[in-house]
Amino acid sequence: MSAALQVDNLSVVYDHFHALKDVSIAVQHGESFGLVGESGSGKSTLLRAVAGLAPISGGAIHIDDEVLKGSKRSKVFYRRVQMVFQDPYGSLHPRQTIDRLLLEPLAIHGIADSDKRIARALDEVGLGNGFRFRYPHQLSGGQRQRVAIARALIVEPSILLLDEPTSALDASVQAEVLNLLEQIRRDRKLTFVMVSHDLGVVTHMCERLAVMRNGAVVERLSSQELAAGAVHEDYTRNLMIASKGFVKA
């Protein structure tokens, strides 16, 4: 069986800056895969390249058996792959109600039964129908991120790209959103690719991970190896030290 997502020798260049350098990863169906590294390491750029939001200068992306080159993505792709961004307020139109925000992807993809789907999506992320006609500024940060997750889920994708989905939230809310995401992944049998600078989060959420530095993958390991401190690169050890609250098993 082919991987749910496979990236082969992917490169992204902005002007003369190499944001990604021949990056390769393979994520299996139903797996939660982590990308970690310091700011500017290329982890978010990799997600954006997969989503068609960054210019690809070399390499290829495979979704199941479909090969993607360049940055153009089809409706079929966005039905299968959705992205949740770091800043929930910035990713939600401030002048649209939650109802409108959730209706838009359904309209784009020609999906019927919008009322039922919107109600079900809000219920799945722990928000009731009472939130349906509110605006983003009327919600807390955690509630806005739940709406962003509902918007991604409403078209029933098989892969979620999660770009630091809890880093903009208060610590007390982070655990709630992470537990929600994990429950959704198990219930829907989704594939996750999660970017985080917090190794504790990745150990909790992901089975395997790739460590990135200066646009390249420098180490690959399982979450068990990371938790046990069985790492090979000094850079990875420094990331462990920098992750406050990270405790080895």
Placement of each model-derived feature along the sequence:
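Helix-to-loop junction immediately C-terminal to a conserved catalytic motif
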Residues: A51
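Conserved ABC ATPase signature
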Residues: Y135-L139, Q143
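ABC ATPase NBD coupling module
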Residues: V67-Q82, Q96, R100, I108, ...
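Conserved ABC ATPase "signature" region
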Residues: D115-G130, I241
